[in-house]
Amino acid sequence: MDTGNWSQVAEFIILGFPHLQGVQIYLFLLLLLIYLMTVLGNLLIFLVVCLDSRLHTPMYHFVSILSFSELGYTAATIPKMLANLLSEKKTISFSGCLLQIYFFHSLGATECYLLTAMAYDRYLAICRPLHYPTLMTPTLCAEIAIGCWLGGLAGPVVEISLISRLPFCGPNRIQHVFCDFPPVLSLACTDTSINVLVDFVINSCKILATFLLILCSYVQIICTVLRIPSAAGKRKAISTCASHFTVVLIFYGSILSMYVQLKKSYSLDYDQALAVVYSVLTPFLNPFIYSLRNKEIKEAVRRQLKRIGILA
């Protein structure tokens, strides 16, 4: 299609929460508090696992990497959301918008792969306990972690490449809280059917495939737990999976509804609500889920606090 007579949009305006203009300052304070607690919580888990030798196991190795990825995942969107809540000019450059989409989706994909790796780790620990030490070696853990990061960073390249070639001649108002594929594609001055299809296929492969692998792992885990004769043994097995399974339900419940759907239209209120869940609430809840439900992490935090003299 000839785009020679069209002027390319240089920046976008992120509308954010247009129906809540009167309470922007309160939203800012609430979001700032959530962001600070998210950063502190995930950073605490990452440092505690790194510093406490008792937590140098495959399960906590993946937990620490997940917490580290959450720091980048939230940094990709929340600081800009905070700035927009205080600013009259809620703009972002075209290249800045694409960078935000890239980092948000690459780190989100990394989280999908890490959650899958954690499910596989729990499957080996519960279903094949005798072979677990020889199967889940430190070398394999490192290789899986590197694979998760490389796969995540490479994931959005095709979609970003395609969207960067689209003409955007106006309007330039993004009806969302941050830059993302669906709301940005809706502003293109040409047919985006190919982009929507590619986005759907990639997200289906990435999100559905990892979710199904996690489900398969948990089906095997449940079958194994049901065969455990003692109630104490069943409780112990379930306790090692409860935190991870809770995170999976919250995270995948929102991203499946948002991204695994073949559509060109965009629903402001519905998609904004989902975006807040998977971009703000899930990273915020993860440290609480992993620490409050995990005695080993709570004990490790106490040991580190005693070591530096905060606790007697």
From Swiss-Prot:
What membrane topology is annotated for this entry?
A: Multi-pass membrane protein
Q: Which residues lie on this side of the membrane: Cytoplasmic?
A: 47-54, 121-139, 218-237, 293-312
Cellular compartments annotated: Cell membrane
An example of a GO molecular function for this protein is:
olfactory receptor activity
Report whether Nuclease shows up as a keyword of the record. Answer: no
Q: Which residues are glycosylated?
A: 5
Keywords in alphabetical order: Cell membrane, Disulfide bond, G-protein coupled receptor, Glycoprotein, Membrane, Olfaction, Receptor, Sensory transduction, Transducer, Transmembrane, Transmembrane helix
Give the superkingdom in one word. Eukaryota
Role, per record: Odorant receptor.
Q: What is the protein name for this chain? A: Olfactory receptor 6N1
Q: Which organism is it from?
A: Homo sapiens
